Amino acid sequence: NDIESMQVLKDAASASIYGSRAANGVIILTTKHGKKGDKKVDVDFTTNLTAQFYTSQSKMKLLDSKGYATAMAQAALNDGLDPVAYASNYGLNLNATEGFGIRAWNPATSQYVDYTVNGLYDGYINSKRTMRLSDTDWVDAISRTGFSQNYNVAVSHATDKSTALFSIGYKDNKGILKYTNFQSLSARLNTSFIINKVVSVGENFTVTYNKQVDCAPMENALKMSPTVPVYEEDGTTFAGPVGGMSDRQNPLRELYHNKDNHLDYWHLFGNAYVDIKPLKGLTFRSNFGVDYTTSFINALTHTFHSDIVNNNIAKTTLGQTNNTNYTWSNTLNYLFDLSKVHHFNVLLGSEINKQSVVDFQAYSEGYALEDVNYMWPNAATGTMSNSGAKFGYRLASFFGKIDYNYNDLLLASFTLRHDGSSRFGKNHRWGNFPAASLGFRFSQLLDKKWLNDAKLRLSWGKTGNQGIDNNAHFGLYVTDYGLDRVTSTAYDLYLQGSGTFPSGYRATQTGNDNLKWETTTQYNIGLDYSLFNYSLYGTIDAYIKNIDDMLINPAYIAVMGEGGNQWSNGPSLRDWGMEFTLGYRKTLECGLGLDINGNLDFYRNKVTSLPSSATGS
């Protein structure tokens, strides 16, 4: 509810000023702020019930127990096997005196064969006689009706020299899978102050706390045999596969044992700025933004016994990740006019961005008590291990932009960026990315009442992509004690066979000092229009996008030995296509706003070149 407007920039000329992080386009979100007037309090509450609804077309058709037994018998007959013996491996008796009937076609005799199905052990599918033959819909067994609540309160106020908005929100979402939920508490403060005629300051910060219990047992629910019950006969022990069945986990047990494995996630996001206007039309802005996240989880693995599937050791895996990302940008913007019809907007700027990630994990096993408050490493009696890493990257940019507007009839823009990234090799760390656009609002030359706005636009631009590992251009080496005596990096110089040995290193990646920016060059031609008092609107857009020096990490043949893995610049790709959007908006007499829109697009792509190292490989 804090979002006031959203804008999507897809063509290279519009997105180029944002640099490499705009390689796939830009979404601009404008958050709400205080508006001049009296103090205002907004309260919003929504609630939803959610459930899994299926139609005959959308639902995956799963076999019930009768269909499962029929398919099993038919498969055995098709392979020339004895269906009775075959089914016994799965806890089924096809020659039972009572149960449900099935029929299968015997290709050897060209006749149907009838069977009566029940559990192999007097109605039970396991020899312990704890799991009776069932007809379980596992998707239904793990599902429930979800329930979500959202509460939002916002207080805003503004004067001639200041604006302020404070909002707080709470969300509670119980998922459609049992024992899953998501809770979120957020707060945002957005203020601005005019200190004097020259200086103004402002900030916009949001802090969010999320608590999430998530699990993904759907694959097991879809593949688990319907003949297996949810619980054993005691009603509390989770059932599981038997005999020749695959070792699928009971999906409801997965959900139940995962209920305490919640991920705690804090997120601080925002920026603070200062504007200085020493001269008319001239503005200097310094903006510092931070994006900080920290997450923690203590993932418990409980002991359980589900017939042939079991776990006898209680385990925990602790994980904590801190991600700090800050951006400091400084811009100088000058707006001026010539002859009242020529309008110019000149922008010069620089920006530095730094990301740092610290990751830590600890593993321990062997607990006398399986409780979320007890299962911490200090209480473990078995194996313990830990791991951790720190990584990040830096990005520096210099950019300039000139916008020209002739009487709102002719529009032109030119942008140039010079970006440098620590992710690339020392020989090609920096890249230049220009862009230009031209717009012609020809509706001003046509005296048509039904035509409110029509603009033809052309654009061309280059953007860079640095979406690779932070250590992509380095040669990497690691120690590894976990391998056997032959392949381990430890040196057993005296052939002891055990103990602590001095260690060497093995290569895991070959460096590449010539690794460079992936570049996208895009051409666009389009038409934007609004008709009939702006009620009918739309766009027509055609584009060609050429991607050169694609960043790839290809597979390598084994004869290259250790460290054959290497990042490189690979093939070139061409995308081309068209996009159409059409919308209709109207405000009804009752004050209700109506906005209906849709889009249609098509595209093609083609690999236009391959590097010599890849040709014929």
What are these regions (language model features)?
Residues 6-7, 27-29:
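Non-catalytic regulatory/gating segments with a bias toward low-complexity or hydrophobic composition
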Residues 3, 22-26, 40-42, 269:
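Extracytoplasmic
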Residues 1, 18-23, 180-183, 217-220, ...:
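Short, glycine-/polar-rich solvent-exposed loops and beta-turns at beta-strand/coil boundaries
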Residues 69-137, 228-254, 372-385, 483-510, ...:
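Flexible glycine-rich, low-complexity coil/linker segments exposed to the extracellular/periplasmic environment
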Residues 184, 190-209, 219, 244-301, ...:
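Extracellular/periplasmic, surface-exposed regions of secreted and cell-surface proteins
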Residues 1-11:
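Short acidic/polar hinge/loop motifs at secondary-structure boundaries
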Residues 35-178, 215-218, 254-261, 275-277:
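Residues embedded in well-ordered regular secondary structure
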Residues 12-17, 34-37, 51-54, 174-176, ...:
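Short beta-strands and strand-coil junctions in structured, solvent-facing domains, enriched
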